[in-house]
């Protein structure tokens, strides 16, 4: 595997300075949506870069390749899979890592939770190192972050907090972000940051940067948020 060229960054400290206090935009349209096409993903990537986004989170090797050719900001690349015998969805295979690296990802993120998986998380972390890309651990607990740090993973994210249990919370996990930050990790806040105020609170809690997805790039989800709120208000008005 050839080392990839890390777009504009020689080391992790440069990337950390570049992303400090910034918004990373995750562009992952709803599966099957009319917007779930590479051309639209590229268009959104260009638009958010023009608006000031400092990095992107993109799913799929083909999408990463297309977006990488169209933007100048770094890409956090992932591959999502639905496996019949494992709950791991985010970059579960070394082959996914290699594909993302060749497609132009600057950072490769993977599920760092300690669950049944097709290939060990140690193997995935090492595979990312072998490509020359930076690694990001998508974590659900502080223990996941400790493991990632012990493996030399450069970025630790709160991505999976609340998504590995039976009940999904509605608010971000600021406590996990704070714990990661206080441990000295390069912390990426991610998961349910649906307003500018919540994103700002993530930075105040110690995150270097915050990743925002649904609120910016999933029109169906945001439309439902507004519809739910206005319909409830309409029912209340009619009740009076």
Swiss-Prot record:
Reaction(s) this enzyme catalyzes, per UniProt: an N-acyl-D-glucosamine 6-phosphate = an N-acyl-D-mannosamine 6-phosphate
Gene Ontology biological-process entries: carbohydrate metabolic process; N-acetylmannosamine catabolic process; N-acetylneuraminate catabolic process
EC number: 5.1.3.9
Alphabetic keyword roster: Carbohydrate metabolism, Isomerase
InterPro entries: Aldolase_TIM (IPR013785), NanE (IPR007260), RibuloseP-bd_barrel (IPR011060)
GO CC terms in record: cytosol
Signal sequence annotation: none
Top-level EC class as recorded in UniProt: isomerase
KW Disulfide bond (keyword) present: no
Annotated GO MF terms: N-acylglucosamine-6-phosphate 2-epimerase activity
Pathway named in the protein's UniProt entry: Amino-sugar metabolism; N-acetylneuraminate degradation; D-fructose 6-phosphate from N-acetylneuraminate: step 3/5
Keyword Transit peptide: no
Function: Converts N-acetylmannosamine-6-phosphate (ManNAc-6-P) to N-acetylglucosamine-6-phosphate (GlcNAc-6-P).
Family of the protein in this entry: Belongs to the NanE family.
Protein name: Putative N-acetylmannosamine-6-phosphate 2-epimerase
């Amino acid at each position: 595997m050839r080392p990839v060229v890390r777009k504009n960054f020689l080391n992790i400290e440069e990337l950390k300075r570049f992303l400090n206090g910034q918004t990373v935009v995750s562009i992952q349209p709803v599966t099957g949506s009319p917007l779930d096409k590479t051309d639209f993903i590229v268009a959104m990537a260009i638009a958010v870069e023009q608006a000031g986004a400092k990095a992107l989170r993109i799913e799929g090797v083909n999408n990463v390749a297309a977006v990488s050719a169209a933007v100048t900001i770094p890409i956090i690349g992932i591959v999502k899979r639905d496996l019949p015998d494992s709950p791991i969805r985010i970059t579960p295979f070394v082959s996914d890592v290699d594909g993302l690296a060749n497609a132009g990802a600057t950072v490769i993120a993977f599920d760092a939770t300690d669950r049944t998986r097709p290939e060990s998380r140690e193997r995935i972390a090492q595979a990312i190192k072998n490509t020359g890309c930076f690694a990001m651990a998508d974590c659900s607990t502080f223990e996941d972050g400790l493991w990632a740090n012990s493996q030399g993973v450069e970025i630790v994210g709160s991505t999976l907090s609340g998504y590995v249990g039976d009940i999904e919370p509605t608010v971000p996990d600021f406590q996990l972000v704070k714990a990661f930050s206080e441990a000295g990790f390069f912390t990426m806040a991610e998961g349910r940051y649906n307003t500018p105020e919540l994103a700002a609170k993530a930075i105040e809690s110690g995150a270097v940067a915050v990743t925002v997805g649904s609120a910016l790039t999933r029109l169906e989800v945001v439309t439902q948020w507004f519809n739910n709120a206005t319909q409830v208000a309409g029912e209340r008005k009619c009740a009076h």
